[in-house]
């Protein structure tokens, strides 16, 4: 029997390895030839054979079988190299964070993929019978990517949100993962424990909703008689053959198919494999097939529109519940997919672009007007072409033309030489397709503390007009200038020009105090707590006990941001030869006027500081008393520091005050009330009497405290003191009473015959003898002050990167202003400062040359885009400089302009020095502490940054500077005046030797230059003096000419330019103060690469740069924070918004299917669809007029959206290798899209506006009533669709039972019990299955009606088909229509 059958089918002898696909083909052919039963019998034998063979070969898998790929090492190394270069570019500010992320992901993805491709050949060559190899390529469950993870590299993973982690897992599972890699792979999709559980339930719920939508769809008829179909065409090559054949097999043709005049397939014929192959070979015209979309029935489906049953390969039987099958076949892979095999990390499967490569070597030419420059996704420069671009490549003997489609990126420049197969252009992937894209925000955080600048204008974001969020209009850099904030009210310096008078309008606000800083040796974390300075009594004194820790080491620098209250006038007093710029301010709190602390900067008139001079001082409000009293030191060693200039004026009373430098931490103040009265005044109290508070003492004085009165009469005045305190009459046993003027620490017993007390605070005991026999002891309260020792700020400056030996240091020193036991007298209610905190300037002494005796201070202004920064520079000056010439400028101000500009004139400019070259090198010292104030835009809150050497880097670009020895003869009397007069107030010339110790910016006002220089005059002057001059203009540009170059003043742009006699092209680079420069930019021809930063100091042979970190930002990014604002580490700088294609991994896939099916508008995905539907809805009725418009508009909209929905869902499943037949998805999509929303335009009598009804029902009602019903198509999600069925019982059993039932009762709805669920709920017979035919009673009427409808509908369907398929015809119809229809008919339609 078997032999006969085999002969009859003449089976082909196969001698090939059979994998999964071959097996599928074999089975389908067996079924075709022999039917189901016989096939299953054959397959059993195949199974047994397989098991026998497997047992015989006994394949086992051991860890030794996992062979790693030899090329892995250098591949990974190569990728690491690439990402290192990328990191560098990011550091230099060439690439921003998003581009860096994208590029690093692509680098690693490519590496991982390449390794995966290497794997198979490697196995095949080394060990073809390796069990791993056999298993992975057997076509059974499991694929290459799993093996790839075992022997290749694990690759990139995605985090729980589906974002890529840009740190790849470089090891494979054979080598074992490191701890970090292990943790990362715990995240990965579906491998995590969390993931599996959650996703399964999601898939289950999806199935439930799907079934709910389509449960009533059953095959009820053989043919619905539709003439429509959907055309599928193999010709245009869009659809791969595999998908094409999958789409066709099992369908039914809707039209005859002709090859020329010969009909090769007829209407209603089922398509099998043979027919499909014939179509593919003949490349016939588009094939029209019937789908569930075209079926004419509302609540069921016919056999021909559904096609073959997937189970047994024949047309589907009547009574088959195809709806439920469809719902389950879509939902079920969801449950599998969650638990499916690993994936490569959900990498952008849609993101890679196609490349255009050069056909041969040669030079490339294209029209540059058609392209404009842009950046690629990875931050590389490229050209974007907006229209088709023809690129010619000229090789030696031949011209190649390459056509580049629009919207592509050209990666080469014009006239560039390209090699064969080099990538010259990148075609953007799938702009037209509806790609799954989502908008992602990425925040960039600051890496270090500093001050923010940016290099272009920014817009305010419209929603935050007054906020600190700005939009960038073009690509630019953001700069963070280093210098960390350490806010404290300890010291704060205001820096202004000398002898200026100005108002400081200052911001009021809470002060912040620094408390208990925990300092680790290298880094300090500050805990700042904000306390109200004048709050309750306990908080009145902020805690400075840890002062010595405020100055942190390492990368932290001091910033003082004081807060001044109200207006304070700044008046600098001149004291001997120093200028003091005091800052006092009045604070109004609870209507009390309390003087607030001020900081004054002291700068000598000539700007020269000696060693240990005081740069600034700060009067701490805690050491300020209003009452008089006596200061007592405990066990304090002090050094009297007396300087002549410390003569302090208090409202006309002069007082000479020495200073005592403190070594120990506490002193005591004993308060007393003192009145100094003229000798003639009458006193109303007696000596040694005891008075209460507010007792009248003289005619116009009352006592402020109660206590003992002492009256002393001096020559011309009377001193009246009131001591507060307890009076104690001692017994004879009391030892304390022997002493007078003793301080008693707390805790000592005070013994008395009657009482025994502990003393809580320090007290001061004073013995008073009013008469010879009696005496008593006055116990007076004492105010204790704790002082921390002065700290050395040397730790602020780490080992010096600028290779300078002399470091300027700032120390904080506390001085007590009064000696031990000195009485302190307050003069007419002024407050008395007991301790002054000073910043003392010092510098290291070199053992070899302790020559550096003085430092010069100068002010520098640096402008950055209109924001002015003042720097106080302190430079060391070597002393053995012999001053020869005197000032030979009669005006006494060197080369300064005559108009009294506000430059700080610190040193005699035209002094001529003479010393050998080596000394010059030494004397060009860097400022080690450059102090820098911050001013807001509105010049309000001032604060101070000290830039240490760690924040600056030094570069010496001017290597070729020649030093000229000064010729002492031939100095004319006033050689420089002609230059100054001819320059006008524009610039100054500085002699080069002196340039390091002072330079500054000239006035910022606009000046018209009228006089031109007489070149010969100038030349002569230069040659006579033989000095090298620098010229600066108002922009702060600095030029460095050769001594014998000519100077030409260009009055147009007010810049100096220097030219050789022979106008040689060699000009020195121009560096302006305040300019930003990126790392890796060379300034000098052979100069070393710089660190990124801002120039704050330009010298003869070197530049000092304040380090800064550039961040690149692209247009559309939002910048947080204000220009010039001080930021802390970790603050948000920029937010990028970029589009990324969602990784096509099934963990994201399921939600994606769900989003499409639910038509959610949260996401940009379905937004596209919704928008499309809207636009189709609007434009078609506008073109066609009302009744036709709605009919055709709805039809077209529905057809379009249906097709795109199906394609989308299939895309997700196919990307996971899941095969689902289109018709299942079609059945569900048909249910989602078959409803229309009645609109209010034409009020119909049948439906109320806003009602959801089926499209076919609306059309039928319109035909029956012969009036236009206005409606528009809506996309319902599956949940809404299942709540909008015809059966309320089915709805109620799904969700919201009470609401649905109540509504149905109120409306009086009728349930016709057509679906399965209603019948199941009520326990009836369900209308499906093979016995279904018996339920439908054939009747005469029933037979007649379909024929008539069939005819009319055929015509109508054809009409629709014409309109639907032939767009050209359609357009011409429209235009004709427009001409034909008169306006009245339009109005008529509107009325109806």
Swiss-Prot record:
Enzyme class, UniProt record, top EC level: transferase
Location, primary (coarse class): plastid
InterPro entries recorded: DNA-dir_RpoC2_beta_pp, RNA_pol_beta''_euk, RNA_pol_Rpb1_3_sf, RNA_pol_Rpb1_4, RNA_pol_Rpb1_5, Rpb1_funnel_sf
Coiled coil (residue ranges): none
Transmembrane segments: none
Entry's localization field: Plastid, Chloroplast
Gene Ontology molecular function, alphabetical: DNA binding; DNA-directed RNA polymerase activity; zinc ion binding
Sites where the protein binds Zn(2+): 224, 295, 302, 305
Entry keyword set: Chloroplast, DNA-directed RNA polymerase, Metal-binding, Nucleotidyltransferase, Plastid, Transcription, Transferase, Zinc
Domain of life: Eukaryota
Biological process annotations from GO: DNA-templated transcription
GO cellular component, one term: chloroplast
Cofactor requirement: Zn(2+)
Catalytic activity: RNA(n) + a ribonucleoside 5'-triphosphate = RNA(n+1) + diphosphate
EC numbers, comma separated: 2.7.7.6
Family listed: Belongs to the RNA polymerase beta' chain family. RpoC2 subfamily.
Subunit structure: In plastids the minimal PEP RNA polymerase catalytic core is composed of four subunits: alpha, beta, beta', and beta''. When a (nuclear-encoded) sigma factor is associated with the core the holoenzyme is formed, which can initiate transcription.
Alphabetized HAMAP family for the sequence: RNApol_bact_RpoC2
Protein purpose: DNA-dependent RNA polymerase catalyzes the transcription of DNA into RNA using the four ribonucleoside triphosphates as substrates.
Protein's name according to its UniProt entry: DNA-directed RNA polymerase subunit beta''
Annotated organism of origin: Solanum tuberosum (Potato)
